[in-house]
Regions:
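Flexible coil/turn residues that form the inter-helical turn or adjacent wing/linker of helix-turn-helix
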Residues: 35-36, 56
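Amphipathic C-terminal alpha-helical segment
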Residues: 106, 145, 163-180, 192-207
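Amphipathic alpha-helical segments used for helix-helix packing
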Residues: 106-127, 144, 168-175
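Short, basic, alpha-helical segments at the C-terminal edge of helix-turn-helix-like DNA-binding modules
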Residues: 69-75
């Protein structure tokens, strides 16, 4: 394939080249919806060829899956680290609020990319949607740990409902431009939503 760009390419080892492509893809998918991102643009930003992108990630959807998987792992790692930093004696309400604040920070760093699959689920990559669904189960498990809840179907309905509320509220926040002065209200609303759902389910909790 004939090169369409004439920028000199830096020689990198395979792991460095893969990381450079992934970095470029992360920035591209953070700035635009999936359909608006091209492999050619990612390759050019990474100083690589389209053939190399396909060699490392097989396809555009494979590249997107890698970005989504990395983002999920980063969010969970940051949330666990923030919770650990609070200490085991921290109030449950504070621990939950902190996890929400971490989520808001992650969203504010790439609002377009975060919101795209929520605004148009039909345009999402099925494999990436599967990653998000499995991640939601991991978030539910994390919430159980924060709240000290046993596995219970009714309580899990409340936890899933809370995550749905949080995403819907955050989507509205993104639409408003992610104003930082609204973060406190979002955190308070989300905590209250979960507390209310658990109350309605008859689940004893420590958010009161």
């Amino acid at each position: 394939m004939t090169r369409t760009d004439r920028r000199p390419r830096q020689r990198l080892d395979p792991e460095q080249r893969r990381a450079a492509i992934l970095d470029a893809a992360r920035e591209a998918f953070a700035a635009a919806p999936y359909a608006a991102v091209s492999v050619a643009a990612v390759a050019a930003a990474a100083g690589a060829s389209e053939a190399l992108v396909h060699r490392y990630f097989a396809s555009k959807s494979g590249l997107y899956q890698a970005v989504v998987a990395e983002g999920i792992d980063e969010l969970l790692t940051r949330q666990v680290a923030a919770d650990t930093a609070l200490g085991s004696r921290a109030a449950v309400r504070l621990r939950l609020a902190t996890s929400i604040e971490v989520y808001l920070e992650v969203i504010s760093n790439s609002p377009v990319g975060w919101a795209a699959p929520l605004r148009d689920a039909h345009a999402d990559v099925p494999a990436a949607a599967g990653l998000r669904a499995r991640a939601r189960e991991r978030y539910v498990e994390l919430l159980r740990g924060i709240l000290g809840l046993a596995v219970d179907p009714v309580a899990d309905h409340a936890l899933h409902g809370y995550l749905g509320f949080l995403d819907a509220a955050c989507l509205s926040w993104v639409g408003a431009g992610c104003p930082p002065e609204q973060r406190g209200a979002l955190v308070a609303m989300a905590v209250a939503a979960l507390a209310g759902a658990l109350d309605a389910a008859g689940v004893v909790h420590a958010l009161s």
